C-alpha cells in the first residue's frame, strides 16, 4: 500500500440493508421550510409536518449520515424510514420520548 492510497470495493455499498423500511408521505402544512437530519427521531419532527406519526415511531430517515431532507411549505414528499439500532434510546430532540423506545407500555411517549 502506498501512503495516501485508498482502495474501493467493486460492489456498491448499501446502507441499512437488513432493516425493514417504512415509506410515508409527508406534507409541510407550515409557512416555512422544515429540514430534518439523518438521525432525528422522525416521530418528533416539527408539528407542521403532517404524516402518520405512529408509523414513524422509533425510526429515522434512510439517508446518508450527516445529510437532511428539506420540506418546503405546501410540498408533499415520500420518505423512507428505518428503525433505530443499538440500545434504541432517544433523548432530547422535542422531549417526547427521553428514554428507551421499547418496553415501557406506552411506546416510550411521554404524557
From Swiss-Prot:
GO MF term set: urease activity
Q: Enumerate the InterPro entries for this protein.
A: Urease_beta-like, Urease_betasu_sf, Urease_subunit
**Reactions catalysed, as given in the entry:** urea + 2 H2O + H(+) = hydrogencarbonate + 2 NH4(+)
Q: Which UniProt keywords apply?
A: Cytoplasm, Hydrolase
According to its UniProt record, this protein's enzyme class is hydrolase
This protein's record includes keyword Hydrolase: yes
This enzyme's EC code(s): 3.5.1.5
Which pathway or pathways does this protein act in?
A: Nitrogen metabolism; urea degradation; CO(2) and NH(3) from urea (urease route): step 1/1
Family, as annotated: Belongs to the urease beta subunit family.
The protein in question is named Urease subunit beta
Organism of origin: Geobacillus kaustophilus (strain HTA426)
Gene symbol of the encoding locus:
ureB
Amino acid at each position: 500500500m502506498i501512503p495516501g492510497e485508498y482502495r474501493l470495493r467493486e460492489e456498491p455499498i448499501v446502507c441499512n440493508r437488513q432493516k425493514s423500511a417504512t415509506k410515508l408521505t409527508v406534507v409541510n402544512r407550515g409557512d416555512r421550510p422544515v429540514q430534518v437530519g439523518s438521525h432525528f427521531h422522525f416521530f418528533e419532527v416539527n408539528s407542521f409536518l403532517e404524516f402518520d406519526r405512529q408509523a414513524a415511531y422509533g425510526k429515522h430517515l434512510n439517508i446518508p449520515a450527516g445529510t437532511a431532507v428539506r420540506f418546503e411549505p405546501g410540498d408533499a414528499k415520500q420518505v423512507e424510514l428505518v428503525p433505530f439500532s443499538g440500545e434504541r434510546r432517544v433523548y432530547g430532540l422535542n422531549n417526547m420520548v427521553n428514554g428507551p423506545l421499547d418496553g415501557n407500555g406506552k411506546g416510550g411517549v411521554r404524557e
